Amino acid sequence: MNINEWEKFSLFQWQECPSIKILHDSVGNKISCIGKSTKRIAIGTLDGRIVILNSRLQLIRDFYACEQGIVQQIYITADQSALCCVVLDKQNFVYLQFWSLNPSKKTNSNSPLCLYEHRLYGIPNPPFPATSLYVSIDIKTVVCGFANGLVIRVEGDFVRDLGSRQDIILREKDSITNLILYSPKKLFVSTTTQVMVYKIKNNTKKVISNHGIPLFCSIQYQGKYIMCAGGSFLSVYTTPDMQLQNTYCVDGTFELLFSSFGLVFVVYTRKNGENGLENNSSIREIKALDVEKRYVLYESLLEQSYDNIFFNSFDCIFFSSTKVPCQLIRLPSDFVLCKMKGKKEHKDAFKIANYLGSPEDTIRECALAAAGECRQQLNFQDATYYYIEAIPFSDSAEIIKFYLEKKLIKELTSYLEALSAKGFAFSHEISTLIYLYIKLRKLDKLTEYVSGCPTEISLPILRKYKCLDQMELLGTIRKLPNVCMEVYQEKGDVEKAFNHLQVCNLPELLRTSNSFGIWLFNSDPMRFMKEAIRNIEILNSQGKDKELSNILKIVYLGIFSQNVQIQLIFLDELLKSKKSENVLKFIYTRKLYALMQKELQHSNPQNELDALQIIHDSQGLLDYESSILCLQAVSWKQVTDLLYSHLSLKEGQDDSLIQQIISDPETVKTLSETYSSEDALHVLKFFVRERSITNKYEDILYKILEACFMQFRIPIQHVLNILVKDGTLNFCFLKPLLLKWMNDYETRIHQNDDEIQVIKNDIEKKRQLLGTIQDSEKVCDNCEGLLDVPFVSYSCLHLVHRDCATETVCPKCKAGYLDKKNSHDQKKTSTFSELFHDFESIDSVML
């Protein structure tokens, strides 16, 4: 990929730094090499000095490593505790040195301490300059490259100066430009013409690139890449396999390659033939590259006078002999975004926000603004892209409406797909996308999409537009047997429908829609009946009586109701296995009803015989009330009488009083001692009904009637209301009983008359007694008010108002007691008028 194709963002800005000019002037043009780390910068000079700066470019060390010598290469160790350098002394000897960067604890001095010094042998005299230096992470190995192609390795404990061993591992014909020990056994070597990997253990080398272009600078970037620059090309290799990942090209020649701010900076020169200038004139440019994301984050012209560059991980300063030093600073991301928004560069703002890893809300805001910009420019394809990136900030309802108005179906589909993929599609968006898939005939996408959509949204749309295959898939995935059956019914695929019954829950299916059962029954009655019986037997074996009863009602009443023959076969099959009492009651009742239907269709005496057999086989497990009602349509007297008899006996079996009377009829004589008149009427109703069916228990019925009249003295009208319901009762049956009742009434009337006479005599005696009392003494012995009638007397002959007689003990003397005859609660007596009224009721019965 060509570097000119990268997008350009202004994330950096120049800033003059006059305060550090003095520092630069102190070393001036004597700089020979620079070593950097995250916290320090080390500068070597041509007069043997080493100047160490901190991250703020403040001087912290300034010492001579070799007086009157030259510092050729500097390397700061990975832990930044020591500095390694290659120096050339005044006698042209080359030395390898290690200097401590931390204050000495023994001497309490801040002066640098030389930890190790070793003369390098094998270098011709006069020596070629050292061009590259690399120290391993564990500070146990140092490799140094020279301009004559020589590579020397020194191994030892340099920090503690415990000795070392020197080897010449390579002799190349070209100058060494860079060395990187990226693993303990592999050394990256670049020369001015080729790139290679040297395996230290095997003493072998593998040439990676040999294109003849001078390669004079290379760096290790983020521990993952090794980059080599030469001519117009920048090659990026991955470690540790050293595979060429990318090659970038510039319209010029590379001068410098370094890493700072986590980016790769390249400085190159190119010829300038623009603006009327001569073609042989050249300009310098600097670019900041993000190698992984392939962005040019900064691009600027660079003055020719800037000949020295100090840089570390977070600083990059350019020095010139004629101008004030300038620092390249990285702008805050918020500032860059605000600047772009102010210029309405919304697209670039979105890309910058993405690159900088801004908060998601910030990225979405930028994307939404960029979408609006593209929409104004009628660039709907890009607008869709930004709308997607702005989810969920984008107004989906407004976008759908706009796209539909403009008939931008493709863009709308893309937007809705992204909305669904990000989980922000709701009912309106989901239904719209399903509709688009159907109309665009994208059935594969429709099938995939509906499998993950809510059923309540997708199913109605699929049903409306007859997307049967998708409905079947949805029913299979979501385990919706009714949906699958609906598809089979729509297709008329009976065989597949019956096969589906093998794996689905038939009761659940029929509860959802009875139309499926009717369709299957009409298609193949016997096959459906067998399937229904199979499901019923499964429920029966599991003991699920409630569900079994429900499906029986659904299948029998809703599906088999029009086919009597199937009903009888179905019920006979069910009776072959053991069932609960409730289920058997339903089966026998419906079987009796089916026979009645059969009789209505074609009369046959055998039908009544079969009905009698069903009643006998049911052993009381029959719904007698409903059976009696339904059999009113046919003239089966024997069946009806038998049902009434069984019903009566069934009711009597649950009544302890009736069972007691049946077992011992003499109990009736003492019925009033234990039971009330309501109980007597209840017993009377039962025996009247039972007699009308079987002509049994006449003697008990007579005794019950006698008890109602004589013991409980129930008004005859209540008794007659019960008796008239029985058409078999006649006056001959009632005559003896009525005569006895009349005699009893006469006796009671005479008894009442005698009681009245006794009361009258008592009143007369009281009146005479009252006449003997003096008028002055006729006061109430309780309230001492004037005594008037009515009054009561105590046994002690004290008299009180009737209202004052609230106690049974005399309130005057506390010795007497209230006369019982005075407080006698007279019962209501029967009169001849009442008797004659009852006679009229009897006459109405006889008539």
UniProtKB/Swiss-Prot annotation:
* Keywords tagged on the record: Cytoplasm, Metal-binding, Nucleus, Zinc, Zinc-finger
**One term under GO cellular component:** nucleus
PROSITE patterns in the record, alphabetically?
CHCR
The listed locations are: Cytoplasm; Nucleus
Identify this protein by name: Pep5-like zinc finger protein C16A10.03c
Q: A GO term (biological process) for this protein?
A: vesicle docking involved in exocytosis
- State a single Gene Ontology molecular function: zinc ion binding
> Cross-referenced InterPro entries, in alphabetical order?
Clathrin_H-chain/VPS_repeat (IPR000547), WD40_repeat_dom_sf (IPR036322), Znf_RING (IPR001841)
User: Which residue numbers delimit the RING-type Zn fingers?
Assistant: 780-814
CHCR repeat ranges are 387-526
